[in-house]
């Protein structure tokens, strides 16, 4: 284990707080090797280390989204292998706020659909998947219809938060389709 890795692991495991995550995010901003190691640890599926590494990544994205851009392809490609719902929720939160490269649209649509329709997926992950799906589908009437059909499936058992998210997206969909004449 190299020095950067051990020091970062120690920082992550000593204390789990918002303040500690902000500190680690600041270190990752200043030192690319720390950022790279955070990404590696996040996707290592070593609990609780993976969860604790993911949180500073989200903080880094919140303050400096440009630092995460080089990792977006990697995030997308690693999603299927994430075992922790907490890590998944964090990565989906980041992906829901950035532009997914077009070459991964099909993969992300399938992934998000499976997560949205899986009753075991956390509410936050479902909400992020709805945002991602809509962002990709927004220019495609057939995909918007599929999203609307998924909403019909979800509605009977959806939480209040998911119903609210679906309502917001449904209004955007109606506006988009009426503006474009679909």
Q: How would you describe each model-predicted region?
A:
Residues 1-182:
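Alpha-helical scaffold domains
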């Amino acid at each position: 284990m190299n020095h950067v890795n051990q020091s970062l692991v120690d920082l992550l495991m000593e204390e789990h707080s918002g303040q500690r995550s902000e500190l680690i995010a600041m270190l990752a901003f200043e030192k690319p090797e720390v950022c790279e190691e955070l990404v590696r640890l996040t996707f290592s599926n070593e609990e609780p280390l993976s969860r604790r590494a993911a949180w500073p990544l989200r903080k880094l994205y919140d303050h400096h989204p440009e630092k995460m851009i080089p990792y977006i392809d990697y995030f997308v490609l690693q999603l299927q292998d994430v075992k922790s719902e907490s890590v998944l929720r964090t990565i989906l939160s980041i992906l829901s706020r950035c532009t997914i490269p077009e070459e991964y649209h099909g993969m992300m649509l399938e992934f998000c659909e499976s997560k949205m329709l899986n009753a075991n997926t956390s509410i936050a992950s479902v909400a992020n998947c709805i945002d991602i799906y809509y962002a990709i589908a927004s220019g495609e009437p057939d995909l918007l219809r599929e999203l609307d059909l998924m909403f019909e499936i979800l509605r009977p058992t959806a939480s209040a938060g998911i119903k609210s998210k679906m309502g917001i997206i449904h209004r955007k969909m109606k506006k988009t389709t009426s503006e474009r004449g679909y």
